[in-house]
Regions:
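Active-site/catalytic core of tyrosine-dependent DNA strand-transfer enzymes
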Residues: 1-4, 79-140
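Short, basic (Lys/Arg/His-rich) helix/loop patches that form interaction surfaces
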Residues: 5-16, 95, 125-169, 173
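Short, contiguous acidic/charged loop-to-helix segments that flank catalytic cores in large enzymes
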Residues: 11-16, 62-77, 110-120, 140-148, ...
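Conserved tyrosine-mediated DNA breakage-rejoining catalytic core shared by Y-recombinases
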Residues: 42-88
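Short, polar N-cap/turn motifs at the start of nucleic acid-interacting alpha helices
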Residues: 47-56, 162-185
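Catalytic-site neighborhood detector that most strongly recognizes the C-terminal catalytic loop/helix
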Residues: 61-65, 171-209
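Short, low-complexity, charged amphipathic interaction modules
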Residues: 207-229
Length: 229
């Protein structure tokens, strides 16, 4: 739906644009390691983004409760679907600028930033629920929220067989240190992070199948006969 933009015709053009933006933010929360709206509002095109040639974000999680670790670092690999979303709704990359500036609206006080974050959370939830019910015709009992994104990120990667250590570190759950350690980066280099996060949308399986089919197509008749003997 985000790609086709086939929203209900009775919606106004203005509401379609707002709903499209909110759906993009919702999907970005899921693909950005389940981060929350406070993280989305503070996400920037920092030096790490440019060091990786625009292939990953690196940020410190915003503390949202007494139980969460303030300052836990997270690295988000920018897989193709996330890149598509960014191209649609994010601000153009400029060093140290906000990726989603419309969330905080340039607020200079923490009180105002919290207010705008809560407002955006509410807008996204309301519009995504409306999309589910009116555009996708899902059951009325289905009411997605930002919490769904975080839980789904962990659950879907776990079901896909991804290491729990990777999932935990990706969500900023490190208990020993608030920083991404060099060991983690060496153990899960960016290409591995890309592979793992691609499993959020079953992209890796499709990619492997396409590679296999391409190899088979390039083989000669003799090679194929040897393969199936």
């Amino acid at each position: 739906l985000f790609v086709s933009k086939k929203y209900p015709e009775h919606w106004s053009e203005e509401y379609m644009q707002r709903a499209h933006y909110s759906l993009g933010l919702f999907l970005a929360q899921y693909l950005c390691n389940g981060f929350n709206m406070a993280d989305a509002g503070r996400l920037t095109y920092n030096s790490y983004y440019y060091q990786t040639n625009g292939k990953a974000f690196r940020f410190n999680r915003k503390k949202t409760s007494r139980r969460s670790a303030d300052g836990s670092e997270v690295i988000v690999p920018i897989i193709p679907p996330l890149r598509y979303i960014l191209d649609e709704i994010a601000a153009p990359p400029t060093r140290d600028s906000f990726v989603f500036p419309d969330i905080l609206k340039g607020a200079e006080t923490e009180e105002l930033r919290r207010k705008y974050t809560m407002q955006e959370n509410s807008n996204v939830k309301d519009r995504v629920i409306k999309i589910c019910h009116e555009a996708l015709n899902w059951d009325k009992s289905i009411c997605p929220s930002g919490t769904w994104c975080r839980h789904s990120f962990a659950t879907n990667l776990h079901n896909a067989g991804v290491d729990m250590d990777y999932i935990s570190e990706s969500m900023g759950h490190s208990t020993s240190d608030h920083a991404i350690t060099q060991i983690y980066i060496e153990y899960y280099p960016l290409d591995i992070q890309m592979q793992n996060n691609s499993k959020l949308l079953n992209l890796e399986d499709s990619s492997e199948r396409d590679v296999l089919l391409a190899k088979l197509a390039s083989m000669s008749t003799e090679e194929l006969l040897k393969l199936f003997k």
